[in-house]
A protein has these predicted regions:
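Cysteine-dependent hydrolase recognition
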Residues: 1-140
Length: 140
């Protein structure tokens, strides 16, 4: 993981770096939470801030219609950032794009690893096995 991270920083993708300005938001439609917003409303606010900051596209994969396949296509095409808001477990997201460890290990986005903000319970619960956050870090 250390060598991968160093390589990622030292040798950026200069041939097709369009994915550096693309991202995704995966969200539930539950709430209200922060500032009285539902998760998908909160994600729309984050999306607009990123678009105002020169991102070219921020995919919206939200409940009730978001699917794992929709999220996988976006990730495999290349994303620099993923924002997630919803339920989580040690091995998965529960909403929007409800991916699990197996889905992450099947991705084909080698070299285009996103920065992930996961606002969910226990995705990083590393002390009881390979958790969801750790799976993302180990994925090739």
């Amino acid at each position: 993981m250390v060598n991968r991270t160093i390589s990622y920083e030292r040798y950026p993708d200069i041939d097709d770096g369009s994915w550096y300005i693309e991202g995704a938001g995966f969200a539930s439609n539950e709430g209200p939470g922060d500032d009285g917003e539902y998760d998908n409303e909160h994600m729309d606010i984050i999306r607009q801030k990123l678009l105002n900051y020169n991102y070219s596209d921020i995919e919206q994969v939200y409940d009730p219609s978001g699917t794992i396949a929709e999220g996988e296509v976006a990730i495999n095409d290349g994303l620099s950032i993923i924002n997630y808001t919803g339920h989580g477990s040690n091995g998965s997201w529960g909403n929007g794009c409800p991916m699990n460890n197996t889905n992450v290990n099947s991705l084909t986005n080698t070299g285009m690893w996103p920065w992930i903000w996961s606002v969910a319970c226990v995705n990083g619960e590393f002390h009881i096995g390979t958790c969801f956050a750790e799976t993302w870090l180990r994925a090739t």
